[in-house]
């Protein structure tokens, strides 16, 4: 199935600002996060789709490539991409028109140089860790140059031979009608070399799979879906090409109490109906400890209390967000006969006072009467 337009996925215009893109992605990520939709395959696919769209549009270079060439401009499997953003359509057209106008392919005089592939690492952290920031150690599986042959792929005491198919250029030219198209050599795969006596440690590949340990600094205020770039810690390049980068993608675990919305936090505040009716002082949790709020008499379910600066200070924020406590009035259950009798007596006393004790109920009753009149 064809991919949807990334701007359409995020629901933004093509001239959307970075902040608009971030807000749109955050909204979709919260809505379709697997933790909130544990049994929904559709939600999981929408979460992945939004994540993929933001990874492209949130990166200046990738967005420019996407705006110009569409999905092909950011597809790492597209011809000429070489693991980075430097190839793609520019290389493809260079191959075709270079033969006509005399322009050579980039690096066309010898083996093709490739940038190493980027790596991604998903790191799950708690909301508390995201708020305060911390240093951590991660182990990343990646390809590294073989210690025995130092990346050559040849057995010790020997060296790779010049590829007989491409003559060491790493590329061959194919005639297609009026055009001569340059393609990666099928024999040496662009290296320009053939391994006749392979290294026993890596079987001639020149690289081995291993885990490397890295120190990563998680900044305070980081949000779900954000990425930390570790330059040069991706896979090694080919033929002397630069290494790729490592991107640590942050996933924040669902919290038992708080839900995050940008720099603000939200929580449900359950109070007994007696406190709702009579008022009182309550302690509420915050990420920094406990805070006290005053519950006024006659508080109803749905009322929201705002505690300023009790949210999270964002990565680029000057001030912390707020904490919003949403009141839920709890109805008592499993009452004894004596308690039921007391409540019935209490209800009778309220009825004697008319509607003044239940303003919302009176308003609702009036609306129902008006609806049926």
From Swiss-Prot:
What's a GO cellular component annotated to this UniProt protein? cytoplasm
What positions does the domain J occupy?
5-70
Query: Where primarily located?
Result: cytoplasm
Cofactor binding note of this UniProt entry: Binds 2 Zn(2+) ions per monomer.
Q: Name one GO biological process term.
A: DNA replication
Q: Which CDD domains match?
A: DnaJ (cd06257), DnaJ_C (cd10747), DnaJ_zf (cd10719)
Which residues are listed for Zn(2+) 2 binding in this entry?
163, 166, 185, 188
Subcellular locations according to the entry: Cytoplasm
Q: Which residues form a coiled coil?
A: none
The UniProt keywords, alphabetically, are: Chaperone, Cytoplasm, DNA replication, Metal-binding, Repeat, Stress response, Zinc, Zinc-finger
Report the stretches of sequence that form zinc fingers (CR-type). 133-211
Q: Which GO terms describe its molecular function?
A: ATP binding; heat shock protein binding; unfolded protein binding; zinc ion binding
Keyword Zinc-finger among record annotations: yes
- Tell me its cofactors: Zn(2+)
Q: Which Pfam families match?
A: DnaJ, DnaJ_C, DnaJ_CXXCXGXG
Start and stop residues of the CXXCXGXG motif repeats: 146-153, 163-170, 185-192, 199-206
Binding locations of Zn(2+) 1: 146, 149, 199, 202
Function text? Participates actively in the response to hyperosmotic and heat shock by preventing the aggregation of stress-denatured proteins and by disaggregating proteins, also in an autonomous, DnaK-independent fashion. Unfolded proteins bind initially to DnaJ; upon interaction with the DnaJ-bound protein, DnaK hydrolyzes its bound ATP, resulting in the formation of a stable complex. GrpE releases ADP from DnaK; ATP binding to DnaK triggers the release of the substrate protein, thus completing the reaction cycle.
Q: What is the similarity comment for this entry? A: Belongs to the DnaJ family.
What UniProt notes about the protein's domains is: The J domain is necessary and sufficient to stimulate DnaK ATPase activity. Zinc center 1 plays an important role in the autonomous, DnaK-independent chaperone activity of DnaJ. Zinc center 2 is essential for interaction with DnaK and for DnaJ activity.
NCBIfam families, per database record: DnaJ_bact, PRK10767.1
- Subunit composition? Homodimer.
Please identify the protein, giving its name as recorded. Chaperone protein DnaJ
